[in-house]
């Protein structure tokens, strides 16, 4: 079924500055390369910057494609207004100002951006239908950005994604009107509450209006059976099968159809459905500028819906992974790219509703993978067991223990579990989180951020793995497999494409490090095409797309339009295959049209701790000043034509980084010289040693709150709600909160703090931070294995003091009895 309304949302705009005469950009072009990805980072979060730095370094994402946000209200959940006007709109505005918007096809989020979006305010009286739910995911809503900015709520439609590769049913399904879709949703809500008579009335009317809809007839059959009308139910089920319904497992396990199971007609219909093998639609290349029609085809006239691929690289708070786990995951994924790994795709089948809602398609998915030369297998149970070769997994279970399966997830794998709360990653969540897949080796995983009501359109179809194996990148594969992605949180490396057959590209006439003047040409030499051809080439200079050349035309550009100094020339070949595979080559060059340069004393630095200043010395004759930038952010300035500056590396974050030097020759900063990039690695400071070892069994599982002199200390067992100071009698008083905690290994851990006042946080006697009121602040601490001491000092406001403090390595949790101790137990 297809529901479509006019899209009146935000649309990406951008221009390409042509430096040569070449192919016009009226039609955009497909594929996904690092130049097409925008990286969104929480500038206040150590974890966010560390994971983003790794992704940028692994994939050579251009510095201009990285956008930083700060002072976010929450890193877990945002309002719909904050999502639109505090996250997506500012990011797209920056990309437009940098002249990059037209080339961006994917927004990828680093950790500590809100995972969920509260969409209740988009509905009348803040009350969305039960079938819709209160929350969307940041990745799903970003993908549906046009609809999300439209002022309507059609982004929650079960067929909101026109890029979705619909299963090729024997009979084409009709398009429902907006009114009919609303009526259908109301009927589903009535069935949830066992109001069979009213639901049957709605569904009977819809069946009359849309007699070709297999799904309407199926739901009508369920409703009639539950109401005790067996003959009417069988008649409706027969109509459903005649119109293409084929999910025998859903019929077998529907609790509403139990009264029909012994009827001969029912068994005949089951046999008819079981004989059907369906095929997925052909894969399609993605570009945000491609418009999609209600039938899932690319609109030749450009009139249709547009999308932005989106994933979150990692989640490192709540029930998330550690930063080290996230970085390891990204490195495994990068190595798997275009590696054509060998192994098996597994589909785990069991009697849980979470399985039966999708596993009717398992045989067809296995057949599709076999036709591609891949190994695929249906296994009975919750997990594949004792399998050392898991290339991908589709499950349906509330909870699972992957280590207990003795199976091995191979690099590049996508793992997907149909369950209610796999994407609810805040602490105290239910069911196994999607992050367990990433912890044990997957490149990507997904889960819904709110109760999905077992609606299959909200999850990937089992054909997800077939799209991935066809050469699509991870992000493309996910969004071709999900009809209604608004609740689905997708986590992983969007660029990972293990089965992409990338060509090898080199350039003749442009050597690395070459000095160029005036007009220059480059002759691409491409191998590894097989029977394919290059459709066209894209020219990028310093990460910005400058031109597009048809195959057969010699790419060229005029360097006089560039500042003197160091630049990077990238040529991307886009092939004429189904997914518009891309191959690229990057060449560093030096432009010298005016004989000007910037001198930097040291351009390569060994590891530098983030708590040490980076001293930069540079000169450029005649300069008004020299800017020092990291990912287009100005971190410091050297005044005049020579001098030094000290940079605070905490702004850069942990990991590999490049500090760009740019000399400014006029007051308006329009005349510049591009100096060399200082390459360095930012590392943690020395580990804080553990305090004297203690037996945790002899300690009390509490923290101790002391207040003004003469008042007895109070034990604190839980701080999750944030109002613990007021409940403990500390309102308006000076206080000290102390506790002990143990870390299992050497490494970097993090505290997350937010309050309506500014306390002082210290670890092992060293001040870690004094967060300003109103915002989450993130403090990394390098700790040796063993016991450590935390202390919080402050004066609580007299009126409703609020303070939340979280700590962790693999995710984060509120300070409390589960992980913190004290040497003396005090009566509460």
Model-derived regions, located:
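Cysteine-dependent hydrolase recognition
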Residues: 31-204, 208, 253, 271-523
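Alpha-helical protein-protein interaction modules
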Residues: 180-263, 276-277
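Short, compositionally biased P/S/T/A/G/V-rich stretches that sit at domain boundaries
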Residues: 491-525, 529, 588-611, 681-684
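Short beta-strand segments within Ig-like beta-sandwich modules, predominantly Fibronectin type-III
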Residues: 545-552, 636-642, 769-773
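Surface-exposed, short loops/turns at beta-strand junctions within beta-sandwich domains
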Residues: 559-566, 649-656, 784
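Conserved structural position at the C-terminal beta-strand
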Residues: 573, 663, 792-794
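Extracellular/secretory pathway-exposed regions associated with glycan biology
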Residues: 681-750, 754-828
């Amino acid at each position: 079924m297809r529901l479509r309304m006019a899209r009146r949302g935000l649309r990406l705009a951008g221009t390409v500055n042509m430096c040569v005469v070449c192919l016009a950009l009226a039609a955009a072009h497909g594929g996904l390369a690092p130049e097409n990805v925008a990286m969104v980072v929480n500038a206040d979060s150590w974890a966010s910057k560390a994971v983003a730095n790794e992704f940028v370094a692994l994939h050579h994402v251009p510095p201009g494609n990285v956008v930083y946000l700060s002072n976010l209200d929450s890193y877990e959940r945002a309002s719909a207004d904050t999502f639109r006007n505090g996250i997506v709109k500012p990011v797209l505005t920056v990309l437009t100002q940098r002249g990059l918007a037209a080339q961006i096809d994917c927004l990828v989020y680093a950790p500590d951006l809100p995972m969920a979006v509260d969409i209740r305010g988009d509905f009348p009286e803040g009350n969305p239908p039960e079938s819709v739910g209160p929350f969307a995911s940041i990745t799903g809503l970003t993908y549906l950005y046009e609809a999300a900015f439209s002022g309507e709520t059609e982004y929650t439609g079960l067929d909101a994604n026109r890029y979705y590769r619909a299963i090729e049913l024997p009979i084409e399904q009709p398009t429902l009107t907006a009114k009919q879709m609303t009526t259908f949703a109301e009927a589903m809500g009535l069935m949830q509450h066992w109001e069979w008579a009213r639901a049957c009335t709605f569904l009977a009317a819809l069946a009359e209006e849309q007699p070709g809809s297999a799904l309407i007839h199926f739901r009508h059959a369920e409703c009639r059976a539950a109401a005790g009308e067996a003959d009417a139910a069988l008649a409706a089920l027969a109509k459903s099968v005649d119109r293409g319904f084929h999910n025998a497992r859903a019929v077998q396990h529907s609790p509403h159809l139990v009264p029909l199971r012994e009827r001969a007609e029912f068994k005949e219909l089951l046999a008819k459905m079981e004989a059907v093998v369906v095929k997925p639609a052909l894969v399609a290349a993605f570009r945000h500028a491609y418009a999609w029609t209600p039938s899932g085809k690319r609109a030749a006239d450009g009139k249709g819906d547009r999308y932005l691929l989106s994933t979150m690289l990692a989640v490192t708070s709540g029930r998330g992974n550690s930063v080290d786990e996230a970085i390891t995951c990204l490195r495994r994924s990068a190595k798997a790219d275009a590696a054509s790994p060998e192994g098996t795709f597994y589909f785990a089948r069991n009697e849980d509703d979470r399985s039966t809602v999708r596993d009717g398609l398992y045989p067809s998915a296995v057949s599709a993978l076999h036709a591609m030369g891949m190994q695929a297998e249906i296994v009975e149970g919750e997990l594949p067991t004792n399998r050392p070769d898991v290339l991908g997994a589709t499950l349906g279970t509330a909870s699972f223990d992957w280590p207990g399966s003795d199976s091995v997830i191979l690099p590049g794998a996508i793992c997907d579990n149909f369950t209610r709360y796999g994407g609810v990653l805040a602490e105290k969540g239910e069911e196994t989180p999607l992050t367990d897949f990433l912890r044990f080796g997957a490149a990507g995983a997904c889960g819904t951020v709110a109760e999905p009501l077992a609606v299959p359109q909200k999850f990937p179809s089992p054909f997800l793995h077939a799209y991935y194996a066809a050469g699509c990148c991870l992000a493309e594969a996910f969004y071709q497999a999900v009809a209604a992605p608004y609740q689905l949180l997708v986590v992983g490396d969007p660029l990972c494409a293990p089965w992409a057959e990338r060509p090898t590209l080199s350039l003749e006439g442009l050597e690395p490090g070459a000095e160029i003047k005036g007009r220059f040409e480059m002759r691409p030499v491409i191998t590894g095409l097989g029977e394919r051809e290059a459709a066209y080439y894209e020219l990028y200079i310093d990460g910005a797309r400058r031109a597009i050349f048809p195959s057969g035309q010699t790419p060229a550009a005029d360097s006089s339009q560039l500042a003197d100094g160091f630049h990077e020339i990238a040529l991307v070949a886009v092939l004429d295959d189904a997914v518009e595979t891309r191959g690229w080559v990057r060449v560093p060059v030096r432009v010298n049209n005016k004989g000007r340069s910037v001198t930097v004393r040291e351009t390569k630095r060994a590891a530098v701790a983030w708590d040490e200043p980076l001293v930069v010395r540079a000169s450029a004759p005649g300069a008004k000043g020299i800017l020092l930038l990291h990912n287009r952010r100005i971190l410091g300035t050297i005044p005049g034509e020579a001098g030094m500056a000290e940079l605070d590396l905490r702004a850069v974050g942990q990991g590999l980084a490049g500090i760009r030097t740019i000399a400014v020759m006029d007051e308006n900063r329009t005349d510049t010289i591009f100096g060399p990039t200082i390459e360095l690695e930012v590392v943690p400071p020395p580990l804080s040693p553990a305090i004297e070892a203690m037996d945790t069994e002899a300690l009390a599982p509490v923290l101790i709150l002391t207040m003004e002199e003469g008042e007895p200390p109070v034990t604190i067992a839980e701080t999750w709600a944030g109002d613990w100071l007021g409940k403990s009698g500390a309102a308006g008083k000076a206080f000290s909160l102390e506790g002990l905690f143990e870390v299992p290994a050497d490494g970097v851990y993090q505290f997350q703090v937010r309050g309506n006042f500014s306390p002082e946080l210290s670890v092992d006697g060293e001040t870690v931070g004094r967060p300003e009121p109103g915002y989450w602040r993130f403090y990394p601490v390098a700790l040796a294995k063993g016991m450590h001491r935390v202390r919080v000092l402050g004066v609580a406001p007299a009126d409703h003091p609020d303070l939340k403090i979280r700590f962790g390595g693999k995710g984060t949790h509120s300070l409390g009895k589960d992980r913190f101790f004290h040497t003396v137990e005090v009566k509460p």
